[in-house]
């Protein structure tokens, strides 16, 4: 799998209160492609960040129905991945990628 394909799978880090609290438990949260599978996410994170991944949990957050100019519309669904890292490993999301 090419690095470009991996960047298509792992879209962005998820910076929320929950994600920050999970960092104490050696977990990191990412927004990922809606069609990405757990094995693909694991390989992409291990390759891009140079860490050992123990497990991946995913969820799909359904898009909200919103109104625009009086007409109902739908926001896009978002897939989130919570990645469990091996003991003693971490990812610095503020530094540049490997």
UniProtKB/Swiss-Prot annotation:
It comes from the Bacteria. Pfam families: Ribosomal_L23. One of its GO terms (molecular function) is rRNA binding. GO terms for biological process: translation. Keywords: Ribonucleoprotein, Ribosomal protein, RNA-binding, rRNA-binding. One of its GO terms (cellular component) is ribosome. Transmembrane segments: none annotated. InterPro entries: Nucleotide-bd_a/b_plait_sf, Ribosomal_uL23-like, Ribosomal_uL23/eL15/eS24_sf. One of the early assembly proteins it binds 23S rRNA. One of the proteins that surrounds the polypeptide exit tunnel on the outside of the ribosome. Forms the main docking site for trigger factor binding to the ribosome. PANTHER family: 60S RIBOSOMAL PROTEIN L23A. Part of the 50S ribosomal subunit. Contacts protein L29, and trigger factor when it is bound to the ribosome. Belongs to the universal ribosomal protein uL23 family. This is Large ribosomal subunit protein uL23. The lineage of its organism: Bacteria, Pseudomonadati, Pseudomonadota, Alphaproteobacteria, Acetobacterales. The gene is rplW.
């Amino acid at each position: 799998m090419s690095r470009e394909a991996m960047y298509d799978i792992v879209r962005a880090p998820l910076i929320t209160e929950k994600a920050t609290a999970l960092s104490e438990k050696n977990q990191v949260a990412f927004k990922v492609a809606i069609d990405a599978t757990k094995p693909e996410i694991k390989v992409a994170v291990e390759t891009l960040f140079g860490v050992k991944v123990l497990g991946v949990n995913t969820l799909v957050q359904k898009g909200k129905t919103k109104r625009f100019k009086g007409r109902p519309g739908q926001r896009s669904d978002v897939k989130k991945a919570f990645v469990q890292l091996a003991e003693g490993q971490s990812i610095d999301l503020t530094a540049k990628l490997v």
